[in-house]
C-alpha cells in the first residue's frame, strides 16, 4: 500500500484515461480513497484473525484419576485462491478491498480487471509482485489475468474452477447473480448495481 501510494498520480491518470472519469474524481477515488479501502481490508482481516485464540487448555475430570489435559493450538489457514473481478468505472477502488483482504488472510489472489480498465490494475499488480519478490516470497502470489478478446470474456469459466475459493465481484446485477448461483465452490461477495427501481415524474402545475 505504501508503494502504491507513492505512485498515486500515475495510477490516477491511468484511471482517468481508462475509466473516463475526470482527473479529480479519478485521482481521489483511484488513488487515496482506493488505498484507504485496501488499508481498511487489512485492518479488518488482521482484527478477525487476532480474535481467534492462538491456544487453549482443555481439561476433562476423570474422577479419582488424573484429569485429561489437552493443550490446543490454532493456526489461521487461508481458504484458497481468491479471484477479484474489477469494474470499468472505479478499477482500483473496487479491486483493492478484495485483493488486500485475500492477502492479509493468507490467500493468493488473481485480479481480473474489466477489459476497459486494465492499466490501473496492472500497475497495482506489478507493484505487489515487486514487494513480494523483495521479501523473498513468490511474486505470483498476486497475479492478473486478462481476456485475449475483450468481447469474449472468460470470467465465468475462471470463476467456476474448483481452485477458486473466494470471489470478490463488482459489476452488473445479472452476472453478480450468476456468480452467486453457480460458483458454489467459493465464498462469493458481490457489489451489484442498485437494487431499487426509481420512477421520477414531473408536473406542469407547481
Regions found by a protein language model. Name each.
Residues 1-65, 101, 134:
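N-terminal Rossmann-like NAD(P)+-binding subdomain of aldehyde/semialdehyde dehydrogenases
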Residues 5, 47-206:
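Rossmann-like NAD(P) dinucleotide-binding subdomain of oxidoreductase/dehydrogenase enzymes
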Amino acid at each position: 500500500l505504501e508503494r502504491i501510494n507513492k505512485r498515486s498520480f500515475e495510477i490516477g491518470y491511468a484511471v482517468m484515461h481508462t475509466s473516463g472519469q475526470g482527473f479529480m474524481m479519478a485521482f481521489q477515488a483511484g488513488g487515496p480513497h482506493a488505498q484507504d479501502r485496501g488499508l481498511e481490508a487489512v485492518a479488518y482481516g488482521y482484527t478477525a484473525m487476532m480474535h481467534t485464540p492462538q491456544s487453549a487448555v482443555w481439561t476433562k475430570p476423570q474422577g479419582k484419576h488424573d484429569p485429561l489435559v489437552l493443550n490446543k493450538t490454532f493456526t489461521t489457514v487461508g481458504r484458497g485462491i481468491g479471484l477479484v473481478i474489477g469494474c470499468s468505472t472505479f478499477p482500483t477502488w473496487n479491486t483493492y478491498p478484495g485483493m488486500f483482504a485475500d492477502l492479509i488472510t493468507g490467500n493468493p489472489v488473481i485480479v481480473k480487471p474489466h477489459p476497459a480498465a486494465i492499466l490501473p490494475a496492472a500497475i497495482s499488480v506489478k507493484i505487489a509482485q515487486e514487494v513480494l519478490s523483495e521479501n523473498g516470497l513468490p511474486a505470483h502470489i498476486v497475479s492478473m489475468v486478462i481476456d485475449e478478446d475483450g468481447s469474449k470474456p472468460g470470467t465465468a469459466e475462471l470463476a467456476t474452477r474448483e481452485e477458486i475459493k473466494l470471489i470478490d465481484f463488482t459489476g452488473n446485477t445479472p452476472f453478480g447473480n450468476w456468480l452467486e448461483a453457480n460458483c458454489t465452490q467459493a465464498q462469493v461477495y458481490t457489489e451489484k448495481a442498485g437494487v431499487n427501481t426509481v420512477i421520477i415524474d414531473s408536473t406542469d402545475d407547481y
